[in-house]
Amino acid sequence: MWDRILGEDGYDSIVHIPMSSGLSGSCETAMLLSDDYDGKVQVVNNQRISVTQRQSVLEAKKLADSGKSACEIKEFLERTKMDSLIFIMVNDLKYLKKGGRVTPAGAALATILGIKPVLKIYGEKLDAFAKARSMKQSKRIMMESIKDYLSKQFKDEFENGRYHLQIAYSYDRAPAEEFKKEVEEAFPGIDIYVDNLSLSVSCHIGPGSLALAVTVDSIAV
């Protein structure tokens, strides 16, 4: 594909934005392959995945339209890689159990207690963040945690609405659309994008999961 883009399609350079190197080996593979293209292919390692990865593509397009080079776009995206955060509510622990990410005993106990774990993706790490006792509580945790992250680390952007929110779901869109209404009330006037959670994440957590993500608008062009 790179050969076609640089050849018959007539482009001078490529900005390639793979999923986070902490969650997949595809980024490292792309970096190795790019060595054969004499700097014409810039592979970005900005630790994004799913809906936040999409936002990186939109940022790259905006920067390219403003006249930035591929190298400048790569530098910006990697410099601002920590300007994004994802929280994921896991609906059913059996998929994490099958993948060896939680013990059978732990999964059984959590199911009995009705616990809905909330995971966090920040940078290259996916970590356990909180334990909710209901879907309602998990949603509240995600929304409050996004507000806390923004108010502490990006106060000016938060107060001036310079950020983007994304909701992602696995399998069923309807709960995501309902969640969107709640998020709109909590973050009035902010653009909210809804889409499928990427398969690379969904396959580990199963159907019925919801994610809430934020990406700070750091572009000044």
Go through each PLM region and give its residues.
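Glycine-rich oxoanion-binding loops at beta->alpha junctions
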Residues: 1-8
